[in-house]
Regions:
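Small-molecule kinase domains that catalyze NTP-dependent phosphoryl transfer to phosphate-bearing small molecules
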Residues: 141-220
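Conserved glycine(s) of the Walker
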Residues: 39
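Conserved phosphate-donor/acceptor-positioning beta-strand/loop module used by diverse small-molecule
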Residues: 115-135
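Conserved substrate/cofactor phosphate-moiety recognition/catalytic segment
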Residues: 42-91
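N-terminal pre-Walker A segment at the start of P-loop NTPase domains
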Residues: 1-21
């Protein structure tokens, strides 16, 4: 159960959402599985626009919690509270947080059942050099830029370091190590029925694939 302060965070987030009417016959709860730097937030925004949905960002909620000196332990519950209201208002919901964890997927499945919605999982991958390049060249979002790290530098550089640390920490959830021929990471098989696996290395390619996927969702 959320505390009064956490409910205020959910209210604050929901108030700034631009609710749009869903473009699918049945409500959709869409979630992504992919490492930091794979493009989850960018692709999620594109998908939300194409299916008539709202984007719910776990990192944005964490920033609100941090500003109010609140712990992160109920981020999922806050996200779900916002999602239920968005679906009830006629929108689809797209989450940009990594859903590789079984517990998180079970919660998403339960949310979809309660809302009589379809839950859809999309896997994102990218060439490692492109992933690292995005992190180094881009501006980290406020959550990473404000996160704690012993690395002393300007906020932007600190944010990049934290995001790289997060990629390193989460890699075993997505890849397994093959020691043959000097060693390489191989994509791990997960017990998930994916609607699609999309390589975001090339922008035009993933944008085309997301548009095709959205068209499928709208027809279903």
């Amino acid at each position: 159960m959320l505390t009064a302060k956490e409910l205020n965070i959910a209210d604050e987030y929901f108030k700034v959402l631009k609710i749009v009417r869903r473009r699918t016959a049945r409500p959709v709860v869409a979630a992504f599985i992919g490492l930091a730097g794979s493009g989850k937030s960018t692709v999620a925004r594109r998908l939300a626009r194409e299916i008539g949905g709202v984007l719910i960002s776990g990192d944005a909620i964490r920033v609100l919690l941090r500003k109010n000196n609140l712990p992160y332990k109920n981020v999922r519950a806050i996200s779900e509270n916002i999602a239920r209201r968005a679906i009830a208002s006629g929108a689809n919901v797209v989450f940009d947080s990594d859903a590789a964890d079984l517990v998180k997927r079970k919660r998403l499945d339960a949310l979809a059942r309660q809302a009589q919605a379809r839950v859809l999982y999309i896997r994102l991958v990218a060439e490692p050099d492109v992933t690292f390049g995005r992190m180094i060249a881009g501006a980290p979002d406020p959550f990473f830029a404000g996160a704690s790290t012993p690395w002393r530098a300007a906020p932007r550089e600190r944010g990049v370091v934290v995001k790289l640390r997060e990629l390193w920490r989460r890699t075993p959830h997505h890849y397994q190590w093959n020691s043959k021929q000097g060693g390489r990471w191989e994509l791990k098989k997960l017990p998930v029925k994916f609607s699609a696996t999309i390589d975001t290395t090339d922008t035009k390619t993933w944008q085309r694939q997301i548009s095709q996927l959205a068209k499928r969702f709208r027809r279903a």
